[in-house]
Design a protein with these regions (language model features):
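Nucleotide/phosphate-binding catalytic cleft detector across ATP-hydrolyzing
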Residues: 1-16, 20-205, 222-224, 233
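Hydrophobic alpha-helix position signal
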Residues: 172, 240-241
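Gly/charged contiguous loops adjacent to phosphate- or pyrophosphate-bearing nucleotide/cofactor binding elements
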Residues: 13, 241-244
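Glycine-rich phosphate-binding loop of actin/hexokinase-like ATP-binding domains
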Residues: 201-239
């Protein structure tokens, strides 16, 4: 099997690291070809890597298991990012135009680039969910083609501590594994579980992990809020025990 025949993704969880290889069909469905996991409770807590060496060793083991099943070498992998430091913040970018101008995609791209460049101390913007654009008195999801001398872009930025991504990079480099891209784990899971109708009408999606619980809120098919609570399946029974 050639490396281009399958896609590999790795999720760094607080209880286990999971690797999966699959083949995407024309209808968008995924056929699972291989699955492997390693316990991570000793070196990943609340989704944050605490021991780089042990994490790299587990990654190497998972890749070997997947390659053994696939009978092929793995070139690149997609990596899921989650954990306690993941959260959302809002930002607004305003552009005053010299005269009434038809809003172009280039202008929207420029506004989005400006939003990406907003400095956040010790944090990194991982993903952006555009909320809406205010043109005059109207709130629009897609303002391209609308004439105006003023536009206000409202964004929901998904951020995490810079060290989160840096430590992931170090572990994969130590393991000799190339990263194809990063995936925001809560978004990927919500997209796999929720329908467009559910996200459009409005819903809350809750994912209970071992050490954390992630809450995502959708409305009008747009992510409106994301938060990670430092409470999971492994800790909640202790908290729920009655006091003596």
């Amino acid at each position: 099997m050639a490396a281009t025949d399958f896609i590999v993704a790795i999720e760094l969880g607080s209880s286990k690291i999971t690797g999966i290889a699959g083949k995407k069909h024309a209808d968008g469905s995924i056929q699972v070809l291989a699955l492997a996991s390693e316990n991570s409770s000793d070196f990943i807590r609340k989704g944050v890597i605490y021991n780089l060496d042990k994490t790299a060793q587990s990654l190497t083991s998972i890749i070997k298991k997947l390659e053994s099943t696939l009978k092929a070498s793995i070139g690149k992998v997609y990596v899921g990012i989650g954990g306690q430091s993941l959260r959302t913040i809002r930002n607004t970018e305003v552009r005053h135009l010299e005269e009434e101008t038809k809003i172009s995609q280039e202008l929207i791209d420029s506004i989005m680039d400006s939003n990406r460049e907003v400095p956040i101390i010790d944090q990194e913007i991982l993903e952006v969910a555009p909320q809406e654009y205010k043109v005059g008195i109207n709130l629009l999801a897609d303002p391209v083609g609308v004439p105006s001398d003023h536009i206000e872009g409202r964004f929901l930025n998904i951020i995490a501590r810079s060290s989160v991504k840096q430590n992931i990079d170090k572990c994969f480099k130590q393991a000799g594994i190339e990263i194809a891209d990063y995936i925001i784990s809560p978004l990927a899971l919500a997209n796999a579980v929720l329908t467009n109708s559910e996200k459009r009408s409005g819903c809350m999606f809750i994912d209970f992990g071992a050490d954390t619980t992630t809450v995502s809120v959708y409305k009008n098919n747009i992510l409106r809020h994301l938060a990670v609570i430092p409470l999971g399946a492994a800790t909640s029974p202790k908290i729920l025990q009655p006091a003596n």
